[in-house]
From Swiss-Prot:
GO terms for biological process: regulation of DNA-templated transcription. This is Bifunctional protein PyrR. Gene3D superfamilies: 3.40.50.2020. A motif (PRPP-binding) lies at residues 105-117. It comes from the Bacteria. PANTHER family: BIFUNCTIONAL PROTEIN PYRR (PTHR11608:SF0). It catalyses: UMP + diphosphate = 5-phospho-alpha-D-ribose 1-diphosphate + uracil. Belongs to the purine/pyrimidine phosphoribosyltransferase family. PyrR subfamily. The gene is pyrR.
Length: 184
């Protein structure tokens, strides 16, 4: 996990690749259990960037567990963020190949921190239609919420200080799986 710290001082390795896989299997089972009566209306939407491969991994788990193909989309929240401060943001674009109206949509992200990303994701998703329900799955919840948002599915709760950061690495985006805490 040498690359995950991005040159910063790594304070702790909190999830290995095997632990990430185990957490995602558990989250997948929890999603299936909670939505058992309406699995045909279930969809996953990964929040760019690392939420997308996590959503695909969860969909793969559900396929293996139940033989069910759950549609997966990618959501770019850039234009819905409240912290752009006049910047010229890079918009990568969303790709949601299904109607969200009437579906139970599980938004997937790597880290839940202040709640602002989740709020922006809900705004972006609601522009595409009115889901029956929106749920939130995160690999890591590090606390320090600024908005009244909580995840429905959490891989691991990691208490952190405001001076620390949580870095998630995934094979698909970073070449390796792992979660580290960096900073003071």
């Amino acid at each position: 996990m040498s690359r995950l710290g991005f040159g910063e001082r790594v304070r702790a390795c909190v999830l290995t690749g095997d632990q990430i896989s185990r957490s995602l299997r558990r989250i997948s089972h929890e999603i299936l259990e909670r939505n058992a009566s309406s699995l045909e209306e279930l969809a996953l939407v990964g929040i760019l960037t690392r939420g997308v491969p996590l959503a695909h991994r969860i969909a793969g788990n559900i396929r293996r567990f139940e033989g069910l193909e759950v549609p997966v989309g990618a959501l770019d929240i850039t234009l819905h963020r409240d912290d752009l401060d006049g910047e010229d943001p890079e918009v990568k674009g969303s790709h949601i190949p299904f109607e969200v109206a009437g579906r139970t949509v599980v938004m997937v992200d790597d880290v839940l921190f202040t709640g602002r990303t989740a709020r922006a994701a809900m705004d972006a998703l609601l522009e595409r239609g009115r889901p029956a329900a929106i749920q939130l799955a995160v690999l890591v919840d590090r606390g320090h919420r600024e908005l009244p948002i909580r995840a429905d599915y959490v891989g691991k709760n990691i208490p952190t200080s405001l001076g620390e950061s949580v870095r998630v690495g995934l094979v698909e985006t970073d070449g390796e799986d792992g979660v580290v805490v960096v900073g003071s």
